[in-house]
């Protein structure tokens, strides 16, 4: 039986064997607080690759030490961090998947002893520290850090880079009027709020020619915040800059009540795909093969990002293939265990 979910997908010179992407999820497992990959990361990501995920995306990886969400985040701010990341990509590749990395800066959501940096001195909520408004020089230094991280990503063997522009972290903070109150060239109009991300994309394009994704929060869930229609314009600009795919999440720039249900963010992937004419990834409570297949068949997205379901079962692709009646090629090490895998939870 043919399946959209298990059809290959090519972006530039990178071909994914299927449309399943492991969504980036922080593991907070750099136990020595130095940003280094640990044995846990090798097992965690390698298992999903062996489970037949098409693209394994490494969690949010900090471009600067002060840009970590926690002191146990992975990092890519120094050349000494390349070796561990390279071991991870090698392990992923050896198990038949492609490897991606999400480059990130936590901004005002950095829960460290050092000052949190943000476009404006506006805290996320009443319990978090008031961030320091970034100077122009700090902005330039951060843009350079993203570029240097892209260089290290190439040296570490990653096939795809994703820029983390969502979930209330630094880039999202610049994009949203709820968190960006600047009156200089990095704040005010949509064009000026976009400038920080524009310059990050330009700087990465100088050193990286592989597939480039951007994760967005397509809805601020606030009457004075951004909506998916605002992101149509942002993503049109991203496409003009050469971004290949928009990973469509939502929320978390301010505290908000979100109506969560299966596939609740697919609407954003569909809207951006249709109105910005750019490839998209759907993410958010996609938990079955049939659900993923329908999203692709309906042309609502191009890739399916799976998060919690892959935490529950690293062999989700095999379960989805069984569900869809698709014969998935097994790793040779597992050939003595053919047949259907139970979908019981």
UniProtKB/Swiss-Prot annotation:
EC identifiers of the protein: 1.6.99.1
Gene3D superfamilies hit by this protein: Aldolase class I (3.20.20.70)
Amino acids binding substrate: 28, 164-167
Entries under InterPro entries matching the protein: Aldolase_TIM, NADPH_DH_bac, OxRdtase_FMN_N, YqjM-like
Cofactor(s) in the UniProt record: FMN
Protein name: NADPH dehydrogenase
Lineage: Bacteria, Bacillati, Bacillota, Bacilli, Bacillales
Entry similarity comment: Belongs to the NADH:flavin oxidoreductase/NADH oxidase family. NamA subfamily.
Subunit and partners: Homotetramer.
Transmembrane residue ranges: none
Natural source organism: Bacillus thuringiensis (strain Al Hakam)
């Amino acid at each position: 039986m043919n399946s959209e979910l298990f059809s290959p997908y090519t972006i530039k010179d990178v071909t994914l064997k299927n449309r399943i992407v492991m969504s980036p999820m922080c593991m907070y497992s750099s136990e020595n607080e130095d940003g280094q990959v640990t044995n846990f990361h090798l097992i965690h990501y390698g298992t999903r690759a062996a489970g037949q995920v098409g693209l394994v995306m490494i969690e949010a990886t900090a471009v600067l030490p002060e840009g970590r969400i926690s002191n146990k985040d992975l990092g890519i701010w120094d050349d000494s961090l390349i070796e561990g990341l390279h071991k991870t990509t090698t392990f992923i590749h050896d198990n038949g998947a492609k490897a991606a990395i999400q480059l990130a800066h936590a901004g005002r959501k950095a829960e460290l002893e050092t000052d949190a940096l943000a476009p404006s001195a506006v805290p996320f909520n009443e319990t978090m520290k008031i961030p320091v408004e970034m100077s122009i020089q700090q902005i330039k230094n951060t843009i350079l850090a993203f570029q240097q991280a892209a260089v290290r990503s190439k040296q570490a063997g990653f096939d795809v880079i994703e820029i983390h522009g969502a979930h209330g972290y630094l880039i999202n903070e610049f994009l949203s009027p709820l968190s960006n109150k600047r009156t200089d060239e990095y704040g005010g109009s949509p064009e000026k709020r976009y400038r920080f991300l524009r310059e990050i994309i330009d700087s990465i394009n100088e050193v990286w020619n592989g597939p480039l994704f951007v994760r967005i929060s397509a809805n601020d869930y606030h009457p004075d915040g951004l909506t998916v229609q605002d992101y149509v314009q942002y993503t049109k600009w991203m496409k003009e800059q050469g971004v290949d795919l928009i990973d469509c999440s939502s929320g978390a720039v301010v505290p908000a009540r979100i109506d969560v249900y299966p596939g609740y963010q697919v609407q954003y992937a569909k809207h951006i795909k249709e109105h910005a004419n750019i490839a998209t990834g759907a993410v958010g409570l996609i938990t079955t093969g049939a659900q993923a297949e329908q999203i692709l068949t309906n042309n609502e997205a191009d890739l399916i990002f799976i998060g919690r379901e892959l935490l529950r079962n690293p062999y989700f692709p095999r379960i989805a293939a069984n569900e869809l009646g698709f014969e998935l090629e097994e790793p040779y090490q597992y050939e003595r265990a053919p047949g259907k895998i139970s979908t019981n939870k």
